[in-house]
């Protein structure tokens, strides 16, 4: 299936080179992607009436469909209807929360090219309306996750735009962010960090 961005440029995930590292299968991980772990965490929060957080769907405009059989349809070409904002949003303790989840295989830094301008602008708007915006960053080689407030992401983005480094060092993430604990249920207990950072 061909998927295109709103500007017509073709989306080709397979063309992005990547090495598949040997994953540590720990009690908290067992080979799941960050998105799968967060989806499971959010399901736990919802089921236990802790928070209501959902993954935002990616809106697609289907352009070409083949019907190899009467009962089957195969989408051959589609476009992203609009640039996506962030991955997740919801409500916790009466506050709107909005966040992006990112993974990196880098050992010492997180590249800012993993963000897009419209995502940064979206996080600015959430903050301007007294919402809570943050990013969950996973260093896959260390199996470490950090919650970093959007104000820091915005500051690092601005630093990049004024000739500064094009990445956030792991040390900066450790200094400004909060290490997330992983377990069985919930998998990634980011609500505990929200309580400490935003509600204490």
From Swiss-Prot:
UniProtKB keywords: Cytoplasm, DNA damage, DNA recombination, DNA repair, Endonuclease, Hydrolase, Magnesium, Metal-binding, Nuclease
Transmembrane segments: none
InterPro entries recorded: Resolv_RecU, Restrct_endonuc-II-like, tRNA_endonuc-like_dom_sf
Subcellular location, record wording: Cytoplasm
Superkingdom of origin organism: Bacteria
Example of a GO MF term: endonuclease activity
The protein's name: Holliday junction resolvase RecU
Organism: Bacillus cereus (strain AH187)
């Amino acid at each position: 299936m061909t998927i295109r961005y709103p500007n017509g440029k073709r989306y080709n995930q397979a063309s992005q080179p990547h090495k598949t590292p040997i994953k540590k299968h720990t009690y908290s991980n067992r080979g799941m992607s960050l998105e799968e772990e967060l989806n499971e965490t959010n399901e736990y929060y919802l089921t236990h009436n802790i928070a209501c957080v959902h993954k935002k769907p990616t809106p697609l405009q289907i352009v070409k469909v083949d019907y190899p059989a009467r009962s089957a349809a195969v989408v051959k070409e589609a476009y992203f209807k609009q640039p996506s904002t962030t991955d997740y949003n919801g409500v916790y303790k009466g506050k709107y929360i909005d966040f992006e989840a990112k993974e990196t295989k880098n050992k010492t830094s997180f590249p800012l090219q993993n963000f897009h301008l419209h995502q940064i602008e979206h996080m600015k708007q959430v903050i301007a309306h007294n919402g809570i915006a943050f990013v969950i960053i996973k260093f896959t080689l260390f199996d470490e996750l950090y919650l970093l407030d959007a104000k820091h992401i915005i500051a690092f983005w601005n630093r990049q735009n004024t000739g500064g480094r094009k990445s956030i060092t792991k040390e900066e993430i450790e200094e400004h962010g909060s290490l997330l604990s992983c377990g069985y249920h919930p998998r990634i207990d980011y609500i505990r960090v929200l309580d400490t950072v935003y509600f204490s």
